[in-house]
A protein has these predicted regions:
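Conserved non-catalytic scaffold segment of RNase H-like nuclease domains
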Residues: 21-138, 142-150, 164-168, 172, ...
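Conserved catalytic/binding loops enriched for acidic/polar residues
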Residues: 191
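Acidic two-metal-ion nuclease catalytic site recognized across multiple nuclease folds
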Residues: 2-33, 196, 200-234
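Generic recognition of well-ordered alpha-helical segments
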Residues: 158, 174, 194, 198-201
Length: 234
């Protein structure tokens, strides 16, 4: 929530997460062959109490939009605040502006995630730095009783494939390269909307590079994970 008089300290970026297994979720042959411009997908974002899902951080907000046949489906959005059952750490409030008061009396993840699961149905899931968001969903499988086995595309990895000359694949940098204006930054729904516009703006350049179907996109994503894991070792 940037407002005048706010300190001009840039927010630190979320660390990049890579999860090889995420891109092993192979849709069937028919699913692989679906052209990206006809793909039914749900583009989503989470806000969280911190950056360490395995160390007890929790989801406090989910926002999602539906994309069908290369268009954002207006009026088909999902937006929920979630009570994390813990105090929201001050440093994370700088990111998302969500306070303990905002989540007081809101449902917990065990209630919200089944609703989100129904919203997603069998659509492909699209997110920026998707392994981060997916890790939170995965760690809640036991309490929520739902798991997300949908194919997943990561905007960060697709950006790394398209703009391999660039170092910065943050949401802001990717949007700027594609000429997309960002609004509603750091609200889950605002970010999901931006991510949907970025994803759609990528379809032309991806097709120019031979990435036309869901299967093609999953293949280049896997290659990017491999590449980035190798680079991280040096």
């Amino acid at each position: 929530h940037d407002h005048e008089g706010a300190p001009a300290m840039p927010l630190p970026k979320r660390p990049e997460f890579y999860d090889f297994d995420l891109f092993k979720r192979e849709p069937d042959r028919k699913g692989r062959d679906v052209p990206l411009k006809e793909l039914r997908c749900v583009v989503f974002d989470t806000e969280t109490t911190g950056l360490q899902p395995s160390a007890g951080d929790e989801i406090i907000s989910i926002g999602a939009v539906r994309v069908t046949n290369g268009k954002i489906v207006r009026g088909e959005t999902f937006e929920r605040l979630i009570n994390p059952g813990m105090k929201i750490p001050k440093p994370s409030i700088r990111f998302h502006g969500i306070t303990d008061k905002d989540v007081k009396g809101k449902p917990d993840a065990a209630t919200v995630l089944p609703q989100f699961r129904r919203f997603c149905g069998t659509a492909a899931l699209v997110a920026h730095n998707a392994a981060f968001d997916m890790k939170f969903l995965e760690l809640k499988e036991k309490v929520s009783g739902v798991n997300f086995t949908n194919p997943v595309l990561d905007i960060l990895l697709l950006s790394a494939f398209l703009h391999d000359h660039a170092d910065d694949h943050s949401l802001a940098a990717t949007a700027e390269r594609l000429g997309i204006e960002i609004s509603g930054r750091h609200s889950a729904l605002g970010d999901a909307m931006t991510e949907a516009r970025i994803f759609l703006a990528m379809l032309g350049p991806l097709a120019d590079r031979g990435v036309v179907t869901l299967g093609d996109a999953l293949d280049v994503s896997r290659k990017q994970v491999k590449l980035r894991k190798m680079q991280a070792r040096f």
